[in-house]
């Protein structure tokens, strides 16, 4: 736990109350009120953080819509970050869907309408020659984790322009709530490169740069200016790319992953949590991942990232790469990806099926999802299409004909874009399918039996990766580190008692889970020579030292 010794600060009076990282509100002691010129600025009664949190929760429950609850929670975050995270800690299962998916999607769409206070940095293309100055202007100086987006592919909602800032803000809140990384170390950044969303361009309330998106060399040069400025300002930072369009996501990751410690959560984080969930689901039915035939609906960067991670895991279980690739089938709107197709994305090419391997298939119909499920005898189905309702009853019944307990993972966010609801899958499979989703869903029921729906959410993985990187002081994130995170999640899932239908442990244990994943990631970083060797005892000590808890510290006054 980060030390709880007194903190010496130069702020006083209203300036202190307006500093979210330091504000304690009604919890300032009598001595602090005198020392920091706060006497008379606060109600007389001195409260504990528990009392403040109880009031905040009472106020939260008074709102009826999730959007209003999100706005209220963001207001607390922007006025008192310690209280914000204490409230999350006390009610994490209820609050997480409000600060992140699914509610954050609506918040991104309405960002300019609900904007209250500044948070993070907005780096616009017209001001690209001032990036160094902008990074110096950040209110947080000792930044260790950055989440950056350009707002082009927000969840399943597409181009949201600067509204995409809601995602880095939400992600970093989870780095703290789940992974114990101090909010003082976290910085959300929005790269404002314009928007192609005409609705936003026509909206008089839109606060971003009103211009079509830049692309090509202009875009790449701008991102490079940003990356080089970050390297100068915080050379040891962990930078997470978030919600970039697939034509930019993979090239940016490949270009910069050896230049600074960075990863793309949509590609690598989604892959790690998906594979961890899949391994755990296979353990639920006493099988290995390498025994499965797997189909993906959606062959974008996220789906292909998961597929490549699955192939690596199959190889760890004893298959050759060629054998593993024959068991993974990618389906997009044009059907099954095969080596006869042209104009495929570079990251899709290694995942095509050879026409020679499927020459015995019945091709009298288009090789769409239903045909692939039937002819490839699919046992695991991933949904990463961002399109509602594409998992049909025919598809699920075909899965059930291939295996007694098919694994169905409709991962698209938000809930309005899910390929099938868990209740639909449960009904069509007559309670046989093992289901996990990308966003939270209520329990399903079938013939009087209730089944819990696990949320295959990146929040199970990326906070632990971040904590592990910081604890090990890693200089990069390898594929092996991501695989270690997946395996750790699966192993942890076996340890916890779970409700019927559940694959992953309850989210209320997320901090314990993140610590264990962080330890596995840090060990792998050392093994991969991306971090200096350290004893297990010292590594555990570092993890504890980096784990921030939402508690108020005593303040002592000092001068600038």
UniProtKB/Swiss-Prot annotation:
A Pfam family: Malic_M
Chain positions of site Important for activity: 266
UniProtKB keywords: Metal-binding, NAD, Oxidoreductase
Binding-site list for a divalent metal cation: 242-243, 266
Entry annotation: catalytic residues: 100 (proton donor), 171 (proton acceptor)
Gene Ontology molecular function, alphabetical: malate dehydrogenase (decarboxylating) (NAD+) activity; metal ion binding; NAD binding; oxaloacetate decarboxylase activity
Gene: maeA
Oxidoreductase recorded as keyword: yes
UniProt xrefs under PROSITE patterns: MALIC_ENZYMES
Protein name, as recorded: NAD-dependent malic enzyme
HAMAP family hit by this protein: NAD_malic_enz
One term under GO cellular component: cytosol
The family this protein is said to belong to: Belongs to the malic enzymes family.
Catalytic class of the enzyme: oxidoreductase
Catalytic activity: (S)-malate + NAD(+) = pyruvate + CO2 + NADH; oxaloacetate + H(+) = pyruvate + CO2
Cofactor: Mg(2+); Mn(2+)
The keyword Repeat is assigned to this record: no
InterPro entries linked: Aminoacid_DH-like_N_sf, Malic_enzyme_CS, Malic_N_dom, Malic_N_dom_sf, Malic_NAD-bd, Malic_OxRdtase, NAD(P)-bd_dom_sf, NAD_malic_enz_proteobac
Assembly and interaction partners: Homotetramer.
SMART domains attached to this UniProt entry: malic, Malic_M
Co-factor: note: Divalent metal cations. Prefers magnesium or manganese.
GO biological process: malate metabolic process
């Amino acid at each position: 736990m980060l030390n709880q010794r007194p903190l010496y600060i130069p702020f006083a009076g209203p300036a202190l109350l307006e500093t979210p990282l330091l504000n304690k509100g009604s919890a300032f002691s009598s001595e602090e009120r005198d020392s920091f010129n706060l006497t008379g600025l606060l109600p007389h009664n001195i409260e504990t953080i528990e009392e403040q949190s109880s009031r905040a929760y009472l106020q939260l429950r008074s709102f009826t819509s999730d959007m209003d609850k999100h706005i209220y929670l963001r207001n607390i975050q922007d006025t008192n970050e310690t209280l914000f995270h204490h409230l999350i800690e006390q009610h994490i299962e209820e609050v997480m869907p409000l600060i992140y998916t699914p509610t954050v999607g609506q918040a991104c769409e309405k960002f300019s309408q609900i904007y209250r206070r500044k948070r993070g940095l907005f780096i616009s293309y017209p001001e690209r020659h001032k990036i160094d100055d902008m990074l110096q202007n950040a209110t947080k100086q000792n930044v260790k984790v950055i989440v950056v987006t350009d707002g082009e592919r927000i969840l399943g909602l597409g181009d949201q322009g600067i509204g995409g800032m809601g995602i880095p803000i939400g992600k970093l809140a989870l780095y703290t709530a789940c992974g114990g990384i101090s909010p003082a170390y976290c910085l959300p950044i929005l790269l404002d490169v314009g928007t192609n969303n005409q609705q936003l361009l026509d909206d008089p309330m839109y606060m971003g740069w009103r211009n079509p998106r830049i692309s090509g060399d202009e875009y790449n040069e701008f991102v490079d200016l940003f990356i080089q400025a970050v390297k100068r300002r915080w050379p040891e930072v962990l930078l997470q790319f978030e919600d970039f369009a697939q034509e930019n996501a993979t090239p940016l990751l490949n270009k910069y992953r050896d230049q600074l410690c960075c990863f793309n959560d949509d590609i690598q984080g989604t892959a790690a949590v998906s594979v961890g969930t899949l391994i755990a689901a296979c353990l639920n039915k006493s099988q290995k991942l390498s025994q499965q035939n797997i189909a993906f609906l959606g062959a974008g960067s996220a789906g292909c990232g998961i597929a490549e991670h699955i192939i690596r895991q199959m190889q760890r279980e004893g298959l050759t790469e060629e054998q593993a690739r024959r068991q993974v089938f990618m389906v997009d709107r044009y059907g099954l990806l095969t080596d006869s197709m042209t104009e495929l994305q570079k990251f899709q090419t290694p995942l095509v099926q050879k026409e020679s391997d499927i020459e015995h298939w019945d091709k009298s119909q288009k090789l769409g999802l239903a045909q692939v499920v039937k002819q490839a005898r699919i046992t695991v189905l991933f949904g990463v299409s961002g399109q509602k309702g594409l998992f049909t009853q025919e598809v699920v019944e075909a899965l059930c004909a291939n295996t007694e307990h098919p694994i169905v993972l409709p991962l698209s966010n938000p809930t309005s874009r899910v390929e099938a609801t868990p209740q639909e899958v449960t009904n069509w499979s007559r309670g046989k399918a093992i289901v996990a989703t990308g966003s939270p869903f209520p329990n399903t029921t079938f013939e009087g039996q209730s089944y819990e729906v696990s949320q295959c959410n990146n929040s199970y993985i990326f906070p632990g990766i971040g904590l592990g990187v910081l604890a090990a002081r890693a200089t990069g994130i390898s594929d092996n580190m991501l695989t270690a995170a997946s395996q750790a999640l699966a192993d942890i899932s076996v340890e916890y008692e779970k409700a019927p239908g559940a694959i992953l442990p309850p989210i209320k244990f997320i901090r314990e889970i993140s610590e264990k994943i962080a330890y596995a990631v840090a060990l792998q970083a050392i093994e991969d020579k991306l971090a200096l060797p350290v004893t297990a005892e010292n590594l555990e000590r570092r993890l504890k030292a980096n784990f921030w808890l939402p508690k108020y510290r005593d303040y002592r006054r000092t001068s600038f």
